[in-house]
């Protein structure tokens, strides 16, 4: 008698992903060192080796974030988990939050804040532009928010929002300052303490050379004080010495940063079972960056990003957005007239094993996004991508000088001493 629930034989074979060079806006090809670290065997969540690994990871990410914040830790989940944990822990229903939007991920901050019950006030820029400090200050004066929430690098537009003057401004007006730096950290300058940020969340899958699945965050003393007013200890683990905060309990159990801090702190109050393999991977991502040196990594992203950008421009393609505010690690180019954008992406993937990105919303079908980030911010990856893209575009009838992209990139590398 056949088993109705027996899966097809194909489903019982191992999954073997095809070889790919991920040159889109993320995720990227993971550094082999990170994959090796993630293959290590698990230990128990209260094993001294495990808690030491957690403490070491906190210390490493303080250097990544350029901060002395005690509460620098990991949220188990994608970069969006870090965003949600920060916003739901800082915002109570009715709180006012100001979100400057210059791409898709500003809209994401708005949606999550609205789901927290906050009053969301938006200011918007045309995609491809960024805000001046004066525009944001005017909005802060008008709205008087509890929190300014802003993306630093938005991969949907490739733009990098200047943050360096916003922290002092927020401090002056009594506003908490949060940034999602998932797409930018490690490839562009980011100074948590110098820029007076109160909360930052990131992911591993861009310039940090890792897979999605862990979200490093850091919290200032001011942010921690706000969260601790809402502190809550679960009934099943609390003792007589535990006291809850006086504020409204955080609506999410999983993303309750007060409880997560108790788990990462000395008392190790049980909250969840740590995603041990992701912890190993996140630790190795930080180690790789800090061994290279943060400034050296940023310079590497600048050089390879410049080579890719100028190589694409030399192939008779128009660059998207304000180039003076572009991230080092991703560039947008308009799809040339008469060229089938998805057919080009398909040929790049199927014929060359290279992935480049499309875009979202008002830019969908109008631009490609090409990344040079993390492990793929390398000369060979840039040149391979330019060679493949030229071959595909020429078959689509796009006019350009033969080898122009690669020649220009090689000129840039010569200028940069590579």
What are these model-derived regions, one by one?
Residues 29-30, 205-310, 314, 416-418:
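Active-site C-terminal subdomain of aminotransferase-like
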């Amino acid at each position: 008698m056949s088993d109705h629930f027996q899966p097809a034989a194909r489903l019982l074979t191992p999954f073997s992903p095809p070889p790919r060079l991920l040159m889109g806006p993320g995720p990227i090809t993971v550094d082999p060192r990170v994959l090796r670290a993630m293959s290590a065997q698990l230990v128990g969540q209260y094993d001294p080796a495990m808690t030491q690994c957690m403490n070491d990871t906190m210390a490493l990410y303080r250097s990544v974030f350029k901060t002395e914040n005690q509460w620098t830790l990991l949220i188990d989940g994608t970069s969006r988990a870090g965003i949600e944990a920060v916003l739901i822990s800082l915002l109570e229903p009715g709180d006012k939050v100001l979100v400057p939007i210059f791409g898709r991920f500003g809209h994401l901050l708005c949606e999550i804040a609205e789901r927290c019950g906050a009053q969301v006030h938006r200011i918007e820029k045309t995609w491809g532009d960024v805000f001046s400090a004066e525009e944001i200050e005017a909005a802060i004066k008008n709205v008087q928010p509890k929190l300014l929430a802003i993306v630093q690098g938005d991969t949907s537009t490739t733009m990098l929002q200047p943050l360096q003057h916003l922290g002092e401004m927020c401090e002056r007006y009594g506003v908490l300052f949060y940034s999602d730096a998932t797409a930018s950290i490690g490839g562009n300058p980011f100074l948590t303490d110098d820029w007076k940020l109160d909360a930052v969340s990131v992911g591993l899958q861009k310039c940090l050379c890792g897979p999605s699945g862990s979200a490093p965050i850091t919290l200032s003393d001011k942010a921690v004080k706000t969260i601790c007013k809402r502190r809550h200890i679960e009934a099943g683990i609390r003792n007589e010495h535990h006291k809850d905060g006086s504020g409204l309990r955080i609506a999410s159990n999983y993303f309750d940063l007060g409880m997560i801090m108790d788990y990462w702190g000395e008392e190790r109050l049980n909250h969840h079972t740590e995603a041990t393999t992701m912890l190993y991977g996140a630790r190795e991502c930080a180690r790789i960056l800090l061994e290279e040196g943060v400034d050296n990594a940023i310079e590497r992203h600048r050089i390879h990003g410049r080579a890719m950008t100028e190589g694409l421009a030399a192939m008779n393609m128009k660059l998207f957005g304000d180039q003076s505010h572009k991230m080092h690690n991703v560039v947008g180019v308009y799809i040339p007239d008469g060229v089938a954008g998805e057919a080009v992406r398909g040929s790049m993937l199927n014929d060359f094993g290279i992935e480049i990105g499309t875009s979202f919303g008002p830019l969908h079908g109008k631009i490609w996004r090409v990344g040079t980030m993390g492990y793929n911010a390398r000369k060979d990856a840039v040149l391979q991508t330019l060679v493949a893209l030229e071959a595909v575009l020429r078959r689509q009838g796009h006019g350009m000088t033969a080898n122009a992209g690669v020649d220009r990139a090689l000129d840039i590398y010569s200028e940069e001493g590579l």
